């Protein structure tokens, strides 16, 4: 029953959000294409997706900066695109 409830919540979030473009379930960065990383799902760290690297103004994680990362990424955010850095902006970190 718990699994069913989690699936329902996930489907509702996907249906009513403007979330990230998900390009496929993977395990590590090396399995993703250029310009993407294998980020953990915001709902479960056991599920990872290939998502685009951060662009200017997008949220980022300051410790997540290496692509490809050889291990399993724990953050749901990818590093910034080439030429951008992840820096603190107010209370968040953003690519700039």
From Swiss-Prot:
Subcellular location: Secreted
GO CC, one annotated term: extracellular region
SUPFAM superfamilies in alphabetical order: Colipase-like
Disulfide bonds: 32-50, 37-78, 60-86, 80-95
UniProt keyword annotation of Flavoprotein present: no
GO terms under biological process: endothelial cell proliferation
Transmembrane segments: none
Annotated keywords: Disulfide bond, G-protein coupled receptor impairing toxin, Secreted, Signal, Toxin
Tissue expression: Expressed by the skin glands.
Record GO terms (molecular function): toxin activity
Task performed by this protein: Potent agonist for both PKR1/PROKR1 and PKR2/PROKR2, and inducer of a potent and long-lasting hyperalgesia. Also potentiates capsaicin-induced TRPV1 current, when tested on DRG neurons. At subnanomolar concentrations, this protein both induces potent chemotaxis of macrophages and stimulates LPS-induced production of the pro-inflammatory cytokines IL-1 and IL-12. In vivo, potently stimulates the contraction of the guinea-pig gastrointestinal (GI) smooth muscle (nanomolar concentration).
Family to which the UniProt record says this protein belongs: Belongs to the AVIT (prokineticin) family.
Name of the protein in question: Prokineticin Bm8-b
Organism: Bombina maxima
Phylogenetic lineage: Eukaryota, Metazoa, Chordata, Craniata, Vertebrata
């Amino acid at each position: 029953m718990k699994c069913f409830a989690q699936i329902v919540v996930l489907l509702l979030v996907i249906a009513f959000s403007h979330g990230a473009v998900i390009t496929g379930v993977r395990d590590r960065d090396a399995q993703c294409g250029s310009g993407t990383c294998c980020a953990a799902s915001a709902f479960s760290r056991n599920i990872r997706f290939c998502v685009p690297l951060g662009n200017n103004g997008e949220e980022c994680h300051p410790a997540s900066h290496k692509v490809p990362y050889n291990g399993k990424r724990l953050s749901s955010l990818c590093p910034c695109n080439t030429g951008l850095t992840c820096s603190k902006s107010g209370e968040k970190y953003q690519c700039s």
